[in-house]
């Protein structure tokens, strides 16, 4: 991970936000900042390599962070089962690259421990 990537991920730790974010929105914001792809572009469905990679990382982090795993990710991110399965496999394969694994680990560390949006959790 380059120093710029680390700064991008760490920048969210020092910000305060005035609205309540849904868990998938929070993950999207952190991933889009770390990967330097605007959140609106990640959501656009564009198939360009860097954009689809950011989208797949978003889904991967959601699937590994949310208590409901894949099913919860499919519901929250509005993604089909096969598409999600492909994305998760793609990201797992990319984790063999130390630089990519460092970036993904930094993103995962930046996620709150409790991503439930239910009261009392």
Task: Give names to the regions the model predicted.
Residues 1-29:
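General nucleic-acid-binding
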Residues 28, 69-70:
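Helix-turn-helix DNA-binding elements, focusing on the entry/boundary residues of the two helices
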Residues 33-55:
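Short, Lys/Arg-enriched anionic-surface-contact patches
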Residues 52-67:
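Short, amphipathic alpha-helical "recognition" segments used to contact nucleic acids or chromatin
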Residues 63, 88, 92-95:
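DNA major-groove recognition helix of helix-turn-helix
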Residues 71-80:
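Short alpha-helical "recognition helix" segments of helix-turn-helix
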Residues 83-85:
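Helix-turn-helix DNA-binding helix
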Residues 95-120:
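Short Lys/Arg-enriched helix C-cap and helix-to-coil transition segments
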């Amino acid at each position: 991970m380059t120093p710029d990537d680390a700064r991008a991920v760490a920048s969210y730790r020092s910000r305060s936000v005035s609205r309540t974010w849904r868990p998938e929105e929070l993950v999207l914001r952190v991933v889009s900042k770390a990967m330097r792809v605007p959140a609106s572009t990640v959501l656009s469905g564009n198939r360009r390599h860097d954009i689809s990679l950011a989208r797949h990382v978003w889904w991967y982090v959601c699937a590994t962070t949310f208590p409901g795993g894949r099913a919860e990710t499919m519901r929250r991110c509005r993604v089909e089962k096969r598409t999600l399965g492909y994305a998760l496999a793609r990201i797992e394969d990319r984790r063999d690259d130390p630089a990519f694994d460092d970036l993904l680990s930094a993103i995962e560390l930046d996620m709150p421990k409790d991503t439930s949006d239910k009261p009392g959790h």
